[in-house]
Amino acid sequence: MISFNIENNDRYHYKKDKDNKDILTDESGQKQVMMEWEKLYMEAAIEKLKPSGDVLEIGFGLGYSANAIQKFDINSHTIIETDENVLKKLKEWAPLQKHKVNIIEGCWQYYLPSMTQKFDSFFFDDFDHPDYPSSSRYQNFLYFYQQIVQKNVKKRAKLAWFFSDDFLVFPCSVFMRWDMYEYITDIPESITDRGYEKPKQMLSRQKIYIPIITFNVDSSEMGDYAFKLTCG
């Protein structure tokens, strides 16, 4: 386990909603970080990813994606998590798993630039941290993507992440393959009545997406073309 000092790292809290469902909120209790209805989406995303080999996961949350990853035949499972309350849950969960779990305590934005290990599978689901402000979830993902393609991607590695909007991407097909799957989700109407903020991107849609990138070559062979992701 690797750890280092990061401020503002006790912002999330585990709670139950009025239906006794698990949720993770910010410190105010008014903004939802993760909700129980996301479980089926997370499981579907991991099923599309089909993780193998060495896995890097960003964020633990309620553990939905981590539990799904552990059902596959993997070699190792590295999770980067910064929040103290979430880390406590993660440390209780990790020893009980079938496959080895490596915990890195801190912000992935801090740690990833110096990480040299290569991985076969990636799952990315972060939440804004005040020490690393970003204009959007997409910008967070783009920075993560640009970091891993430089040095962390094995040949035939796959990347999936939580994304609610459809957007265009123009990767060089020599280096990678892009797949976008539609997912119809059942967002409870009562969310808006529970005293928690319904995610803004979910206000008017039941359809979200599961993006999968498959890298045809490893990091050393990709070059600058691998950086050409475009949001549309």
Question: How would you name each of these model-derived features?
Answer:
Residues 2-232:
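The AdoMet/dcAdoMet-binding core of the Class I SAM-like
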